[in-house]
Amino acid sequence: MVVSTVAVEKPSTADELARQLHDAASQKLAVVPVGGGRARGMGGVPERVDVELHTTRLDRVIEHSQADMVVSVEAGITLEALQHELAKSAQFLPLDPFSSPGHTIGGLLATGWTGPLRLRFGSPRDFLIGIRVALPDGTLASGGGRVVKNVSGYDMMKLHYGALGSLGVIVAASFKVFPKPLRDVTVTSEGGWDGADQALTMPVAPSALEIFSDGRVLARYTGSHDAVDRVIHDLGWAVEDQSIWERHSGRAPARWARIAAPRSGLRRLVEELPRGAGWWASPGIGVAHWAIASDAHSVIGMRAKAEAAGGTLVMLAAPDDFMREVGAWGNPPPTIEVMRRLRDAFDPDHVLNPGRYVV
């Protein structure tokens, strides 16, 4: 019997991580970057794993300028630790990903995971202002603001965001941060999709809006006292305890998928899910999450419907056999050839996360 041993590396500096990545790449060993491990089920089943390269010891706040509202951190810091630090200055990073707690900042950038607050603040890419990445050749490349060196010809922040560590390992990032709102109130109704439409058309837009398979709707309003109090009075929904969002962000089914579609078509797609399916959706964003309790055939069928509507169905977690049967990503995007050329340029031996990303 042959026993495969996976080496586990836990560097404490970016330079050390870059050296370890280069050492592995020079031996053509397959390297899997690991942050908090909260999204390890996302993507295809890795073809092989020789080295796990953990970032959790890269957990420092490098710089926080309260006046400039900018923070620079190492990639292994958890979102919770960063929020705790920012709260001392009445600031925050508007990230509330599912499968929390425990996400690292680097992991969130590599996966592109977001949460309900994306409705108001956008994705992390919208407030990411700088990034530093270790490449397989051992170099540390940077892009954006508060960095030392840019890689000519490439937008490093766009390249590495959501690329699942297939082009390099994120070691640090800088963000614009936001002041904590003066008022933060959540209200709820049983109004289903019509209730969600009502909340979206109020004079003050919600910062987050979620609808659930049982017809329940949550709307979160943030801002000045007068503006928030006026909109929740006019809406007339029941006030919900703010802890509901922490419980909501903890959702992490064993088998689940993210369905993204044009906002106008999201409701129709969700209504095509198998009867009795568990789901929740962000109608203002055009994203739904499906807790899968049906067979692979149902998932493949739903993906076809999503793609026909101009959307996607991406698996976020499933047992390996199920993932292989349905596929993680669906049909390749139109940019697949460009993505392959980039992969060949940054990682010519394909040592980073082989088999996991779409290329």
Specify the residue positions occupied by each region the protein language model found.
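A short linear hydrophobic-aromatic micro-motif
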Residues: 30, 94, 205-210, 276-280, ...
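Terminal amphipathic helices with adjacent charged low-complexity linkers/tails
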Residues: 220, 224-240
